[in-house]
Amino acid sequence: MVLDSLGRALSNALKKIARAGSVDEALVKEVVRDIQRALLQADVNVRLVLKLTKEIQRRALEEKPPAGISKKEHIIKIVYEELTKFLGTEAKPIEIKEKPTVLLTVGVQGSGKTTTVAKLARYFQKRGYKVGVVCSDTWRPGAYHQLKQLLDPYHIEVFGDPNEKDAVKLAKEGVEYFKTRDVDLIIVDTAGRHKEEKDLIEEMRMISEEIRPHEVILVIDGTIGQQAYNQALAFKEATPIGSIIVTKLDSSAKGGGALSAVAATGAPIKFIGVGEKIDDLEPFDPARFVSRLLGLGDIQGLLEKFKELEKEVEFTEEDIDRFLRGKFTLKDMYAQLEAMRKMGPLKQILRMIPGLGYSLPDELISVGEERLRKFKVIMDSMTEEELMNPEIINYSRIKRIARGSGTSIKDVKELLTQYNQMKKFFKSMNKRQLSRLARRFGM
């Protein structure tokens, strides 16, 4: 989970209010101290922390709750509102207005820029845009091959020449090339060789003059914490069309510091990197981000995940009729497990469900994820006939499947039990109920 330790600490602070018999000044001050401690441990700037928590305390002690809202609920709302304001208030998506729209990405060495370019290309491809990627990184020989390796499986074309040494020429040629390929979006990757902001900005200016991008994106490493302020500020002052992506928020205790530092400059954060996989890039929406961080869920985010799934897994009316007649196969179950895997880590999905927040132990979530992985491995060891007709799987077949998948007989039996329960569940539903469920879960 992104900023897991910060989220838990903030969620625990709010629980003190929710569980208290009554709310007085002493409790408010105690909760404010907890919030201060949590933010400082996430490497948020001291001055920013004090300013934020002073406002939370003032509002919590002075404001009267509106009619129908309890004092506890009002204070939780205040914390949510102030944290959202702290991180930028509203979402600022990248807009594809012209065809082609050109995005130029820059970033210092080690920021995760090249991987982020691939994630960005995949993000827009999933939303129906035709994307072309230009590799103008002449400094790192492996950059072009890295982009090819990441994007070839998704049939996203990469333009580049590992032998060319002129980055500006390469960027210009790449943009001109994709203008003839009828793409909607061109993303230009640059060299990440600069350690200092001024060198980075100079290269950005040179390439910008040649390719005239619609937007310039600075990729910032979330692990640098509040040091991100200087990078973001220098960048914001250098270009009026700049936006920011903060990476590696899944692996850093300093991610809160990086996010708040960038937000403090006023530079718009467009996306955040939340994992290593190519789909682990999220549009940054402060309100939804804070809601998840506080354990309050993100229903909109969950619905968007389901919407993405609709394109990945399609079950027809005939399939639904078949399920209702009890003709649900292991192959159908496999398709559902694949769909769940594509939604992202189980922990990330569970955090989107209101009320669940941080209540499930990590160990339990890990067991759930491991179980889903194991089920897929077991089904990969089955024959087509067994997947289509699970009823033929007798004890000798179970032994063979267990041996072939490197699992135990007990694991195979557990999968078959789970399958039979799902089959029974579908058979017990009427067509309208199942159609509604199918639409919701991308079936």
Curated annotation (Swiss-Prot):
A GO term from the CC aspect: signal recognition particle
Positions with a binding annotation for GTP: 107-114, 189-193, 247-250
UniProt GO BP: SRP-dependent cotranslational protein targeting to membrane
EC number of this enzyme: 3.6.5.4
InterPro entries, sorted: AAA+_ATPase, P-loop_NTPase, Signal_recog_part_SRP54_M_sf, Signal_recog_particl_SRP54_hlx, Signal_recog_particle_SRP54_M, SRP/SRP_N, SRP54, SRP54_GTPase_dom
Class of enzymatic activity (EC top level): hydrolase
Keyword list, A-Z: Cytoplasm, GTP-binding, Hydrolase, Nucleotide-binding, Ribonucleoprotein, RNA-binding, Signal recognition particle
Keyword Glycosyltransferase: no
Catalytic reaction equation(s): GTP + H2O = GDP + phosphate + H(+)
GO molecular function term, any single one: GTPase activity
Domain of life where this protein originates: Archaea
Pfam families: SRP54, SRP54_N, SRP_SPB
SMART domains, per the entry: AAA, SRP54, SRP54_N
Domain description: Composed of three domains: the N-terminal N domain, which is responsible for interactions with the ribosome, the central G domain, which binds GTP, and the C-terminal M domain, which binds the RNA and the signal sequence of the RNC.
Family in the record: Belongs to the GTP-binding SRP family. SRP54 subfamily.
Cited PANTHER family: SIGNAL RECOGNITION PARTICLE 54K PROTEIN SRP54, SIGNAL RECOGNITION PARTICLE SUBUNIT SRP54
Function of the protein: Involved in targeting and insertion of nascent membrane proteins into the cytoplasmic membrane. Binds to the hydrophobic signal sequence of the ribosome-nascent chain (RNC) as it emerges from the ribosomes. The SRP-RNC complex is then targeted to the cytoplasmic membrane where it interacts with the SRP receptor FtsY.
Quaternary organization: Part of the signal recognition particle protein translocation system, which is composed of SRP and FtsY. Archaeal SRP consists of a 7S RNA molecule of 300 nucleotides and two protein subunits: SRP54 and SRP19.
Name of the protein described by the UniProt record: Signal recognition particle 54 kDa protein
Organism: Pyrococcus horikoshii (strain ATCC 700860 / DSM 12428 / JCM 9974 / NBRC 100139 / OT-3)
Gene (UniProt): srp54
